């Protein structure tokens, strides 16, 4: 005999996990769709809380050549379901761009064709944040930085002709 009751109990969990798998698949498809000379799709994901609300940050990017400091021939799209204003999103990007996307180079060639955008769907009804210094943004900003750094590193690891990844840390300069 089959354990029908046990199976019935697990169906809601299965449906939820399928939604998660389907969601990840959609992001992989999106990252694959924007590839040009890239050999792999580039995507990153983080979760955290703003107040008591769970929020997600997804990012996809393309680029593998003409990547020099201050971005070049690359596209990056970051999305969050957090409800944050355009001013907050802009400030968060400004605070994190120099140590991520603006710090990478592949071949030293630059281009005018680069872009990073940050979208908020506002789907999550998190607490209203009006100031970039609001302590409820601390963990969110860390997670955003992780997504941006992850995507930046994926771009240079997939650089045209890249065989090595070199990180230079300068202290007491």
Listing of model-derived features with the role each one plays in the protein:
Residues 1-16, 20, 111-114, 151, ...:
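Proteins with a high burden of low-complexity, intrinsically disordered sequence enriched in S/T/G/P/A and R
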Residues 1-101:
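Glycine-rich, mobile lid/loop segments that gate access to catalytic sites or pores
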Residues 1-8, 75-76, 113-133:
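Glycine-rich, flexible beta-strand/loop modules in the N-terminal catalytic cores of phosphate-handling
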Residues 22-31, 45, 101-113, 150-167:
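Flexible, glycine/charged-enriched surface loops at secondary-structure junctions
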Residues 38, 61-65, 82, 107-117, ...:
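Glycine-rich beta-alpha junction loops
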Residues 56-59, 77, 117-118, 167-170:
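Structured core elements
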Residues 65-70, 88, 107-111, 115, ...:
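Short, contiguous, pocket-lining structural segments
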Residues 118-173:
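A glycine- and small/hydrophobic-rich beta-loop-beta segment
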